[in-house]
């Protein structure tokens, strides 16, 4: 039996189960932002889980929610391990994933540039063989 993919499989199950637990909500009043688990990595020995989260809200909401997640790490570790029936409970470490916030910011900047006439109306190149102004002539 090959076990070289086991950490990746366990990480994906860990991410899925943690997402479900967070969707049900935690009782910590600091967790007010919308939390998305964007990814997870498991150490080869399955003793440490790094979970990447994106938190929607202003800076204060993100900081408070992240602090609440870190405080709830022990509870979340136990719940996920119980659901996955892992022999050892992996140590849970949260990392704030800024990629979603960066993507939202880029989208907003592109939208603003389009409305001010500073960017092309379409980010997509025309299909091969299509005239660039097919729609404009109709």
UniProtKB/Swiss-Prot annotation:
GO terms for cellular component: cytosol. The keyword Secreted does not apply. GO terms for molecular function: ribosomal small subunit binding. It comes from the Bacteria. Residues 119-131 have a biased composition (Low complexity). One of several proteins that assist in the late maturation steps of the functional core of the 30S ribosomal subunit. Associates with free 30S ribosomal subunits (but not with 30S subunits that are part of 70S ribosomes or polysomes). Required for efficient processing of 16S rRNA. May interact with the 5'-terminal helix region of 16S rRNA. Monomer. Binds 30S ribosomal subunits, but not 50S ribosomal subunits or 70S ribosomes. HAMAP family: RbfA (MF_00003). This is Ribosome-binding factor A.
């Amino acid at each position: 039996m090959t076990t070289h993919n086991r950490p990746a499989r366990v990480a994906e199950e860990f991410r899925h189960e943690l997402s479900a637990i967070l969707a049900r909500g935690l009782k910590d009043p600091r967790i007010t932002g919308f939390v998305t688990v964007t990814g997870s990595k498991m150490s080869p020995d399955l003793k440490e889980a790094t979970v990447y989260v994106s938190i929607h809200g202003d800076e204060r909401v993100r900081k408070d929610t992240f602090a609440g997640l870190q405080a709830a790490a022990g509870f979340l570790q136990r719940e996920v391990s119980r659901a996955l029936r892992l022999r050892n409970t992996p140590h849970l470490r949260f990392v704030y994933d800024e990629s979603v916030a960066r993507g939202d910011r880029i989208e907003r900047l592109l939208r603003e540039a389009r409305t001010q006439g500073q960017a092309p109306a379409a980010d997509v190149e025309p299909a091969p063989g299509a005239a660039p102004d097919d729609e404009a002539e109709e």
